[in-house]
């Protein structure tokens, strides 16, 4: 009886692991690469902000440069076996601040205001709050 219970538990665990791996692999295969993500974001911003073609080009170029650069910094942290999630967040914040600064130069005032209303203002405030907290923590 005990062996049947152990066997059932082992089979259930094995099934769960295989199902999880299958789901993870399917999600990995379905997820677009970084350049496709940049294109999708540029297309989304074109629809939402009614961007002109030259603006879409600059947004796309910015994202295709900055996304891989951010990922390269993540990879450096991973290779250095950095486990501090704050450091990863700092890298992300740095690159998103840079992207927003570029967007501000590309967008008209109306487009920028719409972009901020779409959630960017909240994200910027959160990044500024984290930065202030980190700087305040260094002074202690």
Predicted regions located by residue number:
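Bacterial Sec-dependent N-terminal signal peptides
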Residues: 1-31
């Amino acid at each position: 009886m005990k062996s049947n219970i152990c066997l059932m538990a082992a089979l259930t665990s094995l099934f769960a692991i295989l199902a999880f791996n299958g789901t993870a692999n399917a999600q990995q295969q379905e997820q677009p690469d970084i350049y496709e993500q940049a294109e999708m974001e540029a297309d989304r911003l074109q629809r939402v902000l009614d961007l002109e073609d030259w603006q879409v080009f600059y947004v796309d170029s910015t994202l295709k440069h900055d996304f891989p650069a951010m990922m390269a910094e993540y990879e450096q942290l991973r290779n250095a076996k950095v486990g501090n999630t704050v450091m990863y967040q700092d890298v992300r914040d740095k690159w998103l601040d840079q992207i927003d600064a570029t967007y501000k130069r590309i967008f008209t005032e109306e487009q920028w205001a719409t972009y901020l209303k779409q959630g960017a203002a909240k994200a910027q405030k959160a990044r500024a709050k984290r930065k202030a907290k980190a700087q305040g923590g260094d002074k202690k």
